[in-house]
Amino acid sequence: MRILADENIPLVHAFFSAFGEIRQLPGRAIVSGSLGDADVLLVRSVTRVDAALLEGSRVRFVGTCTIGTDHLDLDYLRRRGIAWASAPGCNARGVVDYVLGSLLSLAERQGVDLASRCYGVVGAGQVGGRLVEVLRGLGWRVLVCDPPRQALERGDFVDLPTLLRECDVLSVHTPLTHEGAHPTRHLFGREQLARLRPGTWLINASRGAVVDNRALREALAGRTDLQAVLDVWEGEPLVDVALAGLCHIATPHIAGYSLDGKLRGTAQVYRAFCEQQGVPPGVLLDELLPPPWLGELGLDGRADPAWALATLCRAVYDPRRDDADFRRSLEGDEQARRSAFDALRKHYPPRREIDGLRVRLSGEAPRLRQLVRALGAEPV
């Protein structure tokens, strides 16, 4: 069996070498002519998998080590009888850490109490659902908009106009869809952006085209009260430099790039492939994942909860570092910016998730204990 894999998928050899020969290429270099005699194709979101890529190939299994599948032509794969798998939820915790870090940065800049804001989460799947749990666990008011889920289940959902009217913060976590009852391409277009409340913060860590980038650039240029955090962009790896300059935080599609999330993605696709092959998994993620290096952090039980929240989150991750690196990369010409976008992702430094943090609290500290648990850390 021959396996072709994106070179940025971690631990490919550890998980898949027992199945055969592995060849690796940059994700954007995986094209029809590079498939050779591959039976298995392992990709990330930068590789479009469709008839143009696979027609006439030997590929019988496609695995994407990402939560999204908008880069896969699933109808084509089904028609051809090609098995496929993705990694839903693999990086959910990392994205939540990114959103929390962004909120802290915005609050610090504007002198806002995060507990006083109303949060709107658009898309309550693996990532959005996890974010809702954390925000509500912190005791904050959260409204959720997810029309597909609302159509299938009872729940406390609201429509998008209600979110635009009620919420001070909007965090977008939908897949990118172009068809169906609830397409998400340009879900936030000129009309929706014009209806944002004064002082709204808009965070997009889903897919670039869910927000109309041109319309957002115009909105930010015309309304200085709005703030945007963008991790995803239309036209990646080439981004709108003017739009990035108007954002409070701008990053190169790394919100979910925690080490844990990336390894989890490979492991999920590996397990799906083992199931497709009818063999039990022989490799376990726990055997390969390095122990948490965050260690233990001590907090005075009398500490202010807002200060404690910032301290804990920033002990794990602060997106402002990635923002600074990304802005430096936008100074070159078009080709240099394209290359820099991919290079920042390829050479992204290891980052762990807050789940691995242990927090030692002095005294009873019931409020801080609840805060620590809400974040997903372990109070001791």
Swiss-Prot record:
Originating organism: Azotobacter vinelandii (strain DJ / ATCC BAA-1303)
Q: Which GO terms describe its cellular component?
A: cytosol
Q: According to the UniProt entry, what is the EC number of this protein?
A: 1.1.1.290
Organism phylogeny: Bacteria, Pseudomonadati, Pseudomonadota, Gammaproteobacteria, Pseudomonadales
Indicate what this protein is called per its UniProt record: Erythronate-4-phosphate dehydrogenase
Note the InterPro entries from the entry.
D-isomer_2_OHA_DH_cat_dom (IPR006139), D-isomer_DH_CS (IPR029753), D-isomer_DH_NAD-bd (IPR006140), Erythronate-4-P_DHase (IPR020921), Erythronate-4-P_DHase_dimer (IPR024531), NAD(P)-bd_dom_sf (IPR036291), PdxB_dimer_sf (IPR038251)
Provide the alphabetized UniProt keywords. Answer: Cytoplasm, NAD, Oxidoreductase, Pyridoxine biosynthesis
Q: Where in the cell does this protein reside? A: Cytoplasm
Query: Known HAMAP family for this protein?
Result: PdxB (MF_01825)
